[in-house]
Structure formats: structure tokens, C-alpha cells
């Protein structure tokens, strides 16, 4: 490039946008190449000017986390989500109004990533972290309730299921179907899950 300083931010944005489009249309290999290229550029730009480019870097890392989750490369997904979360925590400390929703979104996805792998303690940890920052983002409570239930903490889980029953009933029930398909519900918790399903269906 004749003048990379001028054009690299636009190039990274174009790559990131196209990478997201490819992810949404399941062209995962193409998506990964573009997002990795965008991340490399944005990482370089963020070193020189963090205030301007760190949010873009975190956004690309978050999108890569989603991509890797979709293709079940969970370790890489975790790495990207954690990198994005670290940036969002820093940004939220300075400007909570703008960045809290992004931080909560990253916590939510990390929580579900750990749920999907049967790591219920870590799922609880990130659900609580997200809820601490923004109690209005209620979908994070689907992960918190499930992580408690599948650890055998029925009473704590039941309280959340009842509190958000009207608002999140369909999400709760579809999560259970997903967990059954993944085979992550411990046999000793199956009766508890059925009890909650009946409770939600009343």
C-alpha cells in the first residue's frame, strides 16, 4: 500500500464486515481468513493508538470467538472471547455507558461456551460477572440458572427460573433441548431438569 496508515483502518473494517457476512452464511474458512487478517491489522493499530483502535480489535476478537464456537473449536473460541473481554473491561472502567453492553455480551457468550462443554462452575462465574455489570440484560440469567441447576443447586436455580419465567420461558426450554442434544446433562440432574420443565410449562 502507498499509505498504509491512511487505508489500513478501512481495509480492516472491510475485512471484518465481510468476515462476519461469511460467518453468517457458513463460509467459515473464508470468514476465519478475513477476521484473522483484520485482527492482525487492528492489533497493530491498537498498539500505536489504543484509544481509537482497541474497541475495533475487541470487536474482531469477539467475532472470531463466535466463529470458532460455531465450528466447535472451543479452545480458540474461549481464547478470543477472553481477549475481547479483557479489552471491554478496560474500556468499561473508563466509559461504562458505551461499553458495558459489549462486556455483558462477551460474558454471556463465555458462560454459554462453558455450559456447552459441561463446565458449569466457569459458566456460573461468567454469568455472574455479566449480571454484575448489567442487571437489565436478562438473557444472561438463562445461563446462570442452568449452571446452578446442573451443579445440583436446585433451590438457587429454581428462584431464577421462577423470577424470569414469563420473560424467558422459551429460552429456558430451548436451552434444555440443546443440552440434551449435546449430552451435557449429568444423569443425576435429569430429574431436576424435568421438574423445572414442568414448572415452566404451568
Regions found by a protein language model. Give the residues of each.
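Boundary/linker segments of alpha-helical solenoid repeat arrays
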Residues: 45-46, 91-93, 98-100, 136-141, ...
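TPR/TPR-like (Sel1-like) alpha-helical repeat modules
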Residues: 81-85, 146-172, 197-201
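Terminal, low-structured helical/coil segments at or just beyond the last alpha-helical repeat
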Residues: 167-202
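Conserved alpha-helical positions within TPR/SEL1-like repeat arrays
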Residues: 9-24, 55-70, 101-115, 139-146
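Residue signature of alpha-solenoid helical repeat architecture, marking inter-repeat boundaries
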Residues: 2, 9, 48, 52-55, ...
Amino acid at each position: 500500500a502507498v499509505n498504509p496508515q491512511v487505508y489500513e483502518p478501512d481495509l480492516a473494517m472491510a475485512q471484518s464486515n465481510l468476515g462476519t457476512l461469511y460467518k453468517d452464511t457458513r463460509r467459515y474458512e473464508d470468514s476465519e481468513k478475513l477476521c484473522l487478517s483484520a485482527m492482525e491489522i487492528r492489533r497493530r493499530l491498537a498498539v500505536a493508538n489504543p484509544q481509537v483502535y482497541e474497541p475495533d480489535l475487541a470487536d474482531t476478537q469477539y467475532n472470531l470467538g463466535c466463529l470458532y464456537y460455531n465450528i466447535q473449536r472451543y479452545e480458540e473460541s474461549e481464547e478470543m472471547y477472553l481477549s475481547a473481554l479483557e479489552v471491554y473491561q478496560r474500556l468499561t472502567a473508563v466509559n461504562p455507558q458505551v461499553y458495558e453492553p459489549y462486556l455483558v455480551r462477551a460474558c454471556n457468550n463465555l458462560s454459554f461456551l462453558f455450559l456447552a462443554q459441561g463446565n458449569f462452575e466457569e459458566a456460573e462465574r461468567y454469568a455472574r460477572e455479566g449480571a454484575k455489570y448489567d442487571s437489565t440484560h436478562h438473557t444472561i440469567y438463562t445461563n446462570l440458572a442452568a449452571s446452578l441447576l446442573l451443579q445440583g443447586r436446585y433451590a438457587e436455580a429454581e428462584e431464577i427460573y421462577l423470577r424470569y419465567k414469563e420473560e424467558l420461558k422459551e429460552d429456558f426450554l430451548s436451552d434444555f433441548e440443546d443440552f440434551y442434544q449435546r449430552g451435557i446433562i449429568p444423569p443425576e440432574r435429569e430429574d431436576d431438569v424435568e421438574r423445572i420443565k414442568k414448572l415452566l410449562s404451568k
